[in-house]
Amino acid sequence: MAKKKKSNATNAARLLESSISPIVEIKYPEPLFTIAAHPTKPILLSGLATGHIYCSTYDADILEEAQSTKREKLSLLEKEAFKTGKIAHINRSVSQSKQKWWTVIEDNADIPDGSNIVNNWKTKRHKGSCRSAIFDPLENSLGENIYSVGTDHIIKKANTETGKVLSKATISEHYSDKNDAITKLVHSTSHPFLLSGTENGDVLVYDSNNMASNQLKFNVSKAHDDSINHILPMPAVSAYHYLTLGSTTLSHIDIRKGIITQSDDQEDELLSMCFASDHVNDNKNDTVLVSHGEGIVTIWKNSKNRLMDQLSRIKVNKEASIDAIIPTMNCDDGEMVDSVWCGDSEGLLHRINYKKGKVVETRVHSSAAGKHGPADEVGILDIDYDYRLISAGMDSLKIWSNQEETLNSDSDDSDSDDSDSDIGSNDSEDSDSDDDDVAINNKIEDEVNDFSPDSDSETGNDDSDENLEDVADSDSNEDQIENVTDEEHQLSDTELPTKSLQIIRKKRFNVPEISNKTNINKKVVDINKLTKEQSTKKADEEPEETEEPDKKKQKLKAKQMSTKQIRNMQKHEHGIRRFDDL
């Protein structure tokens, strides 16, 4: 019985898994609900289900250097073990490595000395859980303040360095339903507008410079029928315009007037959205990428249909939901500027090139069961001040290296022969042998050649269908074949390259099979003529039957001549230009 085929998502993740590793991994004993990265400094906020907020600082350069040095040492030890036969193959996968070469913090509340990461301060900021926390994005106070909200229905503004609360606002009195709660916080990038989305689909707007007054500045009622999943500012359009996601629709709202447009029902939950990196850099708010609960990312354009419906979709992981999406923010790299990061419920990170419409890189945030589920689902993504990706679930947080993939490209020749593919070595035991690798590679090359229509004409290898067409054309011109001149018989082998000689041999091999079929048809006609002659004797029929094969054999020899076929090809009589260089 054949082996059960693995899911496409698993195979794709293993094939596209990047060699980039984290520089630090922080584990949280209590569920992690929200994170935020400082826009200009290596400062990290983390809000927990207990209502605590931690403000941490990390030395990114030292962490990068430490993980790179340790990885090189482990790589050398692994190569030595492979040469001595202690291990079957060299592992190139980051997620399947038994040893971690990056810094691992087992408890975020108890960080050991010398870890190159410290907690600046921690506090019990909210009585319930901390739902959302963000840094101040205004240009004149960039990153100086933080805003947080919890299930206690209080928004608090605090200083980033000290953690001291500067002002707060109680928002429960502005709910349309007393059982409502805040799900999301977003601040305008140009105006003191602090937006909060609720579980009932409302958007409440406060003045971040005057929160102590507890006055509601704007209110958009029922932007969606269900909980607000995401709010995205549109600074290129107006400081009053925002995009919101809720349930199965996308809405374009003006916080002064209400809903401008609302999309068609997508029949799938819309979870997160972002602008592409080039649109963020060029201050454009036209192309929007939206993540779905069914494992896809859709592309929307305001200029095409006013965001009424999706234009195209990219399949990411049909086995999981895409819970978070964020632009790379790196406009210095041509590949990165067209890409966005997204995290799914299976603990995988995917980099999508939205212009190519496919996943181009995969990283594994969590491959094992977590404390709060089968896997640590990637529910939060952020980008730090130096374009490093930050991924987080409820159990752990990882800051990924921003170095390019260089380690896997520096492979030794001695190792590449025995371990060409980590995937093959993990899937079966036979893939450790060189013979099986060669056989698999040859099989793959044959399959690729079968599916590439131009491969034969470029390499000079003809398939059986082309041979049949050439011979059929030569049979239709039977008189020309029989009148082959002596000069054509005397073509020297030096006039043709070795590749063309291989073509001739293949055609000679197929010519008798085709010519036999034509001879069989002629033989039937001759037998019918012979049966009509009743006066002939059996003794006279026998030599005729013996003479016919002799004549037919001569015709076979004439048809086996490849010079006619070569001449026809050189004159392009078949429309195939294969010997233009001769």
UniProtKB/Swiss-Prot annotation:
User: Which compartments does it reside in?
Assistant: Nucleus, Nucleolus
Gene3D superfamilies listed in its UniProt record:
YVTN repeat-like/Quinoprotein amine dehydrogenase
Ranges of compositional bias, category Basic and acidic residues: 531-540, 570-582
Region described as Disordered: spans on this chain: 405-496, 531-582
Domain of life where this protein originates: Eukaryota
One GO biological-process annotation of the entry reads: ribosomal large subunit biogenesis
Extract the SUPFAM superfamilies matched here: WD40 repeat-like (SSF50978)
Instruction: Quote the cellular component terms of the Gene Ontology held in the record.
Output: nucleolus
The WD repeats are found at 27-68, 125-168, 177-216, 265-310, 373-410
Spell out the Acidic residues composition-biased ranges: 410-438, 447-485
Keywords for this entry? Nucleus, Repeat, WD repeat
Family label: Belongs to the WD repeat WDR55 family.
Specify the protein name.
WD repeat-containing protein JIP5
Please name the taxonomic classification of the source. Eukaryota, Fungi, Dikarya, Ascomycota, Saccharomycotina
